[in-house]
Amino acid sequence: MSAAEIAALLRNAEVTGGEIRRAAIHLPKPLRASLYDETSREHRTAEGKFFEAFVYEMLLAEAEQSDSVVSVAAKLSDACYVPYDKYAKDGLWYSKDGGIRFKVSGRVAAEVDFLVKTTDCVRIFGEVIVNPAKAGNLASEVAEKRALLERLYECEVQFVLVCAEQVKEPKYLRETDAAVVLESGHLMYQRLHPNEVLHKKSAPAKSTRRVDGTVW
């Protein structure tokens, strides 16, 4: 399985209310409130975080139905935070909010939005961005993250860019990479009434594919 096939899984997915709800509930309560308040300074940040969580929940759901996906790294409220051990070797360490981060010599060297591994041992990382055209130095960031992951895992890795607005396919993508547009995916929360989200507790989706990122 390839990055293009992961992109196709997302593109062809049938979105459910449960996925949208779980995605919104991954956000801390203050950000959930900002999600439904267009006057909030944090509104756009909340939409971006929601979109990231939404893609993660879609990946879990689609992976469960696919024999080609062996694992999706847990993140956000599904992740298990462990304080950093300064004697540990370089690798993945979750942030307190469940972000997927890689530390080198004790410092955060990279953060990625998702990690997927296929049954034929292809490792894929992804970035989730509403509009990549506004993302600044995304090309150099992707190159640096790719180089780090290939060094840590000693294999070639593929990349998927997920965005919510139509853009030209970036020139920096390799032939093995892929891009997918989930149009207005950052607005899916609007399908839910705020009361379905604002004060609910997180409950992880049932998944046989979700794994701790440290064993991805």
What function would you assign to each model-found segment?
Residues 1-216:
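Intrinsically disordered, low-complexity Ser/Thr/Pro/Gly-rich regulatory segments
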